[in-house]
Curated annotation (Swiss-Prot):
Residues reported in the UniProt entry to bind ATP: 6-10, 139-146, 178
Source species: Haemophilus influenzae (strain ATCC 51907 / DSM 11121 / KW20 / Rd)
Recorded metabolic or biological pathway in which this protein acts: One-carbon metabolism; tetrahydrofolate interconversion
Homology family: Belongs to the 5-formyltetrahydrofolate cyclo-ligase family.
GO molecular function, one term: ATP binding
GO BP field: folic acid-containing compound biosynthetic process; tetrahydrofolate interconversion
ATP-binding found in the keyword field: yes
Name the record gives this protein: 5-formyltetrahydrofolate cyclo-ligase
Amino acid sequence: MNTQKRQQIRTEIRKIRANLTALQQHQAEQSVTQHALNLIEQRQAKNIALYFSFDGEISTKALIQSLWMQNKNVYLPVLHPFTKHYLLFLRYLPDTPMKQNQFGIWEPKLNVQNVLPLNELDILFTPLVAFDKKGNRLGMGGGFYDRTLQNWQNKSFIPVGLAYQCQQVENLPTEHWDVPLFDILVG
């Protein structure tokens, strides 16, 4: 029952998100970027993991540009080449060679010299499809971030979701593997 309900929420929220106007998207991106920069400053974060927006997710382009201007280290997720459904985080610079992964998402070409261990991240910003007030997130269904975020409380980083207001639902049905986020920044 939970699986069916979760898939229904994914479908509904993705449809709502796809219907946002360009102006709504831009305003939300500006708002979330400012919230994220404030959080980064408060936590004195230096190593920040982000993602390239996909399928209508809130854009991270302005945030990435701002972080580069502040000399912060930006990392993007890469599908782990050997451990299925896990992510690695690679340093991302303006000249980093990129490729599309099996899902059509742009990621840095794997270079082990650019991999940062999770314990060295300060903030890990995550995409999401839906969220609730308790910090529960619903992703695309692959479990990549749930696996990556397991036991995040024992690591040095905090996981923070980035979302549009329209992605909030009253109560998300959860599974035992779901990992609530430290915070969700909404635009």
